[in-house]
C-alpha cells in the first residue's frame, strides 16, 4: 500500500516521477485567471486564523466571500448555514469543516486541503474532527507570526510569476496601480477585463451600470451603441496600460445572431428606456458587442477568455439570501458550438480574431471545443485558439485527465497553456502542483506503455511548456 500523499503522490510510474521532479515541480506559476483581491496583495494582508483563509466571511458591503467549494462540502454534510456563511465563531466553523472533510473521499477538496496543510504549514497528519484543534493552533500560530505566511509571502514561496485578477471595466484599478509602482513586489499582477455587466442587457441593473460606465469615461450618458463601443474601447486601453494580458467573458451560452448597427442601436435604446428585451434582441446586442470587443483585443494583443455553460443561482431562496457566487450554481447543457465557430469566423473574416481560450463547464462539450480549435489556428502564436483547462466542477483528477486526453486526441497538448487557480484563496497554488502531478502521470504512462518515445529533449519541452513556458509565450509575459 502506498503512503498517503508522499512525495510520489499521484505519480504512478518511474517516468511520471522523473518528469515531475526533474521538469515540472520547480517551474514558475502563471496564474492567468483568478479572483483574488489585489488590495490584499498590496497591503500584504496577514490572516488571523485559518478559517478566514478557507471559509471567508462577509465583505463591508454585506456580500459574501470565501471558497464555495468548501461551503458545498459543508452543506452536503448537513452543516447548518450559520456555520458556513453565518456569524458563528471561526473556531466552530472550522470544526464543522474539519468534521465534514473525511466524507469527501474522492473529492479534490480532500487532496487540496491536505496539500495546503503539508506545503504551507508543515503538517504531516490529515485534517478531521479529531485533529481540528491541533491543526487550528498550528495554522493560526504560523499565520500570525511566520513572515512567509503573509499574502505576498505565500505568493513568493509558491514561485508565482504572474497573477491575472478579474476586474470590471468601471474599476479604477487603484490597487493594481499601487502594486505596479511598488518595487518590493517582484511578481507581476495584472487586471483582466471582464465586461459581463455591459453585455447583460437583459438583466436587472443594466441601465444603472451603463450610467456608471458613462461616468468613468467622462460622459453624462452613453446615448447610442457607438457610444457604448467607444466607452468599452477606452476602458480596454486603460486596462492595457495597467498591464492587462487577458480578458474574460462569463456567458450563460455563447450567442451569435447578426444584426445591423441600426438594429442594435434600437435594441439598446429600448433597454435604456427600461423596456424588457427579447432573447433574440439580447443575442443581437451581445453578438455585436462581442465582435467589437474581439477586434479590440486583437488590436491590442490580449487574449479573450470565454467561460460558458454555467446555470447560476438555481436555489432561488438561498441565492436571494446570500447573493451570487455562494455555491448554488450548476453545469448547464446549452449547445452553442456553431455559435462559437460563427463568432470566431466573423472575427477571422477581417483578420481580427484574437487569441482565444474556450472553457465550457459541461465536459460533454470537450470534443466539440477540440474540433473548433483546429479551424481557426494560424501562425500568430502556437495554439492561438486554446481549449481551456478543466474548469470549476471539472478541476478534479478525472476532469483534468479527460480534458487533457481529449485535447491531445484532437489537437496539440504540447501547446496547452496549462492550469490556473480560478480561486479566491492565497493558499490555492497547490492546485497547480496537483495539476502538474496529473499531467506528468498521464505523459509518463504513455511513455511507459510505448505510446510515445522516451525522448528526453521532447518530454522536457512538453512538460515545461505546459507548466509555464507556453503561458509565458501566449500572454507575452
Regions found by a protein language model. Give the residues of each.
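Metal-cofactor-binding active-site regions of metalloenzymes
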Residues: 2-300, 352-354, 358-370, 374-477
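C-terminal amphipathic alpha-helical interaction region
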Residues: 304-306
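Short, basic/hydrophobic alpha-helical segments
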Residues: 343-349
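Short glycine/proline- and charge-enriched loop/turn segments
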Residues: 319-327
Amino acid at each position: 500500500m502506498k503512503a498517503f500523499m508522499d512525495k510520489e503522490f499521484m505519480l504512478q510510474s518511474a517516468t511520471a516521477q522523473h518528469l515531475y521532479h526533474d521538469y515540472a515541480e520547480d517551474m514558475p506559476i502563471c496564474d492567468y485567471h483568478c479572483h483574488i483581491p489585489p488590495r490584499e496583495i498590496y497591503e500584504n494582508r496577514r490572516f488571523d486564523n485559518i478559517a478566514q483563509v478557507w471559509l471567508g466571511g462577509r465583505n463591508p458591503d454585506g456580500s459574501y466571500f470565501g471558497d464555495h467549494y468548501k461551503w458545498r462540502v459543508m452543506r452536503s454534510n448537513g452543516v447548518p448555514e450559520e456555520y458556513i456563511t453565518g456569524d458563528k465563531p471561526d473556531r466552530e466553523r472550522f470544526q464543522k469543516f474539519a468534521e465534514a472533510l473525511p466524507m469527501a473521499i474522492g473529492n479534490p477538496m480532500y487532496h487540496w486541503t491536505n496539500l495546503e496543510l503539508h506545503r504551507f504549514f508543515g503538517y504531516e497528519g490529515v485534517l478531521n474532527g479529531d485533529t481540528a484543534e491541533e491543526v487550528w493552533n498550528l495554522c493560526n500560530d504560523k499565520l500570525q507570526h511566520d513572515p512567509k505566511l503573509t499574502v505576498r509571502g505565500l505568493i513568493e514561496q509558491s514561485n508565482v510569476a504572474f497573477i491575472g485578477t478579474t476586474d470590471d471595466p468601471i474599476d479604477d484599478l487603484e490597487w493594481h496601480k499601487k502594486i505596479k509602482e511598488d518595487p518590493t513586489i517582484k511578481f507581476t499582477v495584472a487586471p483582466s477585463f471582464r465586461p459581463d455587466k455591459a453585455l447583460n442587457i437583459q438583466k436587472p441593473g443594466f441601465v444603472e451600470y451603463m450610467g456608471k460606465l458613462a461616468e468613468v469615461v467622462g460622459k453624462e450618458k452613453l446615448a447610442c451603441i457607438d457610444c457604448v463601443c467607444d466607452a468599452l474601447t477606452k476602458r480596454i486601453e486603460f486596462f492595457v496600460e495597467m498591464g492587462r494580458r487577458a480578458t474574460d467573458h462569463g456567458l450563460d451560452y455563447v450567442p451569435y445572431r447578426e444584426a445591423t448597427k441600426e438594429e442594435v442601436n434600437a435594441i439598446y435604446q429600448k433597454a435604456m428606456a427600461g423596456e424588457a428585451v427579447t432573447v433574440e434582441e439580447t443575442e443581437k446586442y451581445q453578438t455585436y458587442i462581442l465582435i467589437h470587443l474581439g477586434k479590440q483585443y486583437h488590436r491590442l494583443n490580449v487574449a479573450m477568455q470565454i467561460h460558458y455553460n454555467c446555470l447560476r443561482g438555481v436555489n432561488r431562496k438561498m441565492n436571494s439570501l446570500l447573493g451570487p457566487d455562494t455555491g448554488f450554481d450548476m453545469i448547464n447543457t446549452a449547445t452553442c458550438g456553431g455559435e462559437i465557430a460563427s463568432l470566431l469566423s466573423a472575427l477571422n473574416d477581417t483578420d481580427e480574431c484574437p487569441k482565444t481560450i474556450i472553457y465550457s463547464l459541461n465536459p460533454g462539450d470537450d470534443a466539440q471545443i477540440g474540433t473548433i480549435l483546429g479551424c481557426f489556428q494560424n501562425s500568430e502564436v502556437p495554439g492561438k485558439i486554446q481549449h481551456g483547462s478543466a474548469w470549476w466542477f471539472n478541476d478534479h483528477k478525472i476532469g483534468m485527465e479527460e480534458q487533457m486526453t481529449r485535447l491531445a486526441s484532437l489537437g496539440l497538448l504540447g501547446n496547452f497553456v496549462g492550469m490556473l487557480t480560478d480561486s479566491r484563496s492565497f493558499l490555492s497554488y497547490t492546485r497547480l502542483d496537483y495539476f502538474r502531478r496529473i499531467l506528468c502521470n498521464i505523459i509518463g504512462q504513455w511513455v511507459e506503455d510505448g505510446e510515445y518515445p522516451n525522448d528526453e529533449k521532447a518530454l522536457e519541452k512538453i512538460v515545461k511548456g505546459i507548466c509555464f513556458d507556453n503561458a509565458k509565450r501566449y500572454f507575452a509575459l
